[in-house]
Amino acid sequence: MHDKILILDFGSQVTQLIARRIREAHVLSEIHPHDVSDEFIRDFKPTGIILSGGPNSVTETDTPRAPQAVFEAGVPVLGICYGMQTMAEQLGGKVDSGHLREFGYAEVRARNHTSFLDGIQDFATPEGHGMLKVWMSHGDKVLEMPQGFQLMASTESCPIAAMADETRHFYGVQWHPEVTHTVQGRAMLERFVLKICGAKPDWEMGNYIDEAVENIRKQVGDEHVILGLSGGVDSSVAAALLHRAIGDQLTCVFVDHGLLRLNEAEQVMSMFADNLGVKVIHVDASEAFMSKLKGVTDPEAKRKIIGAEFVEVFQTEAGKLTDAKWLAQGTIYPDVIESAGKGKKAAHTIKSHHNVGGLPETLNLKLLEPLRELFKDEVRELGVKLGLPPSMVYRHPFPGPGLGVRILGEVKREYADLLRRADAIFIESLRTFIDKDTDKSWYDLTSQAFAVFLPVKSVGVMGDGRTYEYVVALRAVQTLDFMTAHWAHLPHDLLGHVSNRIINEVRGINRVVYDISGKPPATIEWE
């Protein structure tokens, strides 16, 4: 049984980073809504509790508060930003709406000697005071600390920037240790989790595989499982894990909608059916998808059609497997957090061809989500340990509707054939061109790269003749979180090489352009 850190989410945009930083310290952490019941907290048996930041003001009525059981659980508690403010208010301190807000970098002076900050600093003043470079994002501030607390840190505009009750092991910080801008943030969280809470750092992917396999076998027994295999990272890793656990009790359904990358269907079948021995039903539904997409130009309409058609095809195939009792999905932890914590998922339309939401009710199948505790980077690590090739596990994101949203306007088979060949040349070139400064390929240096088919023709000259052919745009971005992105400054010789190959090798394209738009104002995908 692993030690667990309970994170209560008050709505911060960076709450997931808290969990990730703690897991990087090899301690299991889970995020749950701030309004969980006292009974839930007792049953969870946390080794420590963290209260996240949030957009609300403690000074207003009807804003969130922590369950009273948090402060009665007998375990260390860390309040971050709003979490510190609600801790102060609930334990008898005073919070006020600050007239001088703090957003961005700040230098914090450590005060007194506390177990939370002792020995942690970025630099010292000539007087010997320990200083920290942190990231602030708050308007409210604590005016009076609750009884039993001592001052832990301060800034010029925020006299109580951190507080500590060493007896009860309650700590509050006004800054965000989970973001990389707080230089010593990782050290602070590790100090709290490993030293103050005393959590054992035993959250390892190797151990996770053994535990997951055991749990899957207990849950499934001798019953059969069906999984929609898209070729994406999540469903691929889920298939590999399930196959290790239950072998031939797993059947995967791979739906080819005709909008996959070059040779992708063959690669998926080779990897899972031939190399791993997974039972895979390959359904070539490209004609049905193309028929439904004929004449449709609106991007969201295309997404909905592709999603609905996938559900229909998958439902038909699943209905033939009369012995299947479970439906497996590649749901990962961020999906679980959004669904449980903010209710966002319920409002989302189908965005990918492998989203099979609603099928459990339709098919009367029990739901199995073997990856629901893992973040994306953990899923990738798991995939490698399960024997999937890194080239598959670490490849760039690919939209669920596939090339359907990389072909502007109406989707035609001719357009898809041209695009997948151009895209393959671009990706192959990114993999082979090495940056001399980093000794990494440009594929590894970009977060996402792809070609886009533009349904317009331009005049060109090839040989002694005039051409009138289609245009392809290349897109490559660099990003940490895909919320914002910079266009990648690819070397000119690389772009020239790609353009030359596409124009010479893909008949029907005579012009290649490069997209230099950032996000915002543009999105990463064109549709």
From Swiss-Prot:
Pathway: Purine metabolism; GMP biosynthesis; GMP from XMP (L-Gln route): step 1/1. Catalyzes the synthesis of GMP from XMP. PROSITE patterns: GATASE_TYPE_1, GMPS_ATP_PPASE. GO terms for molecular function: ATP binding; GMP synthase activity. Homodimer. This is GMP synthase [glutamine-hydrolyzing]. GO terms for cellular component: cytosol. It comes from Paraburkholderia phymatum (strain DSM 17167 / CIP 108236 / LMG 21445 / STM815). Keywords: ATP-binding, Glutamine amidotransferase, GMP biosynthesis, Ligase, Nucleotide-binding, Purine biosynthesis. Residues 4-202 form the Glutamine amidotransferase type-1 domain. The keyword Ligase applies. Residues 203-395 form the GMPS ATP-PPase domain. The active site is at C81, H176, E178. Disulfide bonds: none annotated. The keyword Transport does not apply. Its EC number is 6.3.5.2. It catalyses: XMP + L-glutamine + ATP + H2O = GMP + L-glutamate + AMP + diphosphate + 2 H(+). ATP binds at S230, G231, G232, V233, D234, S235, S236.
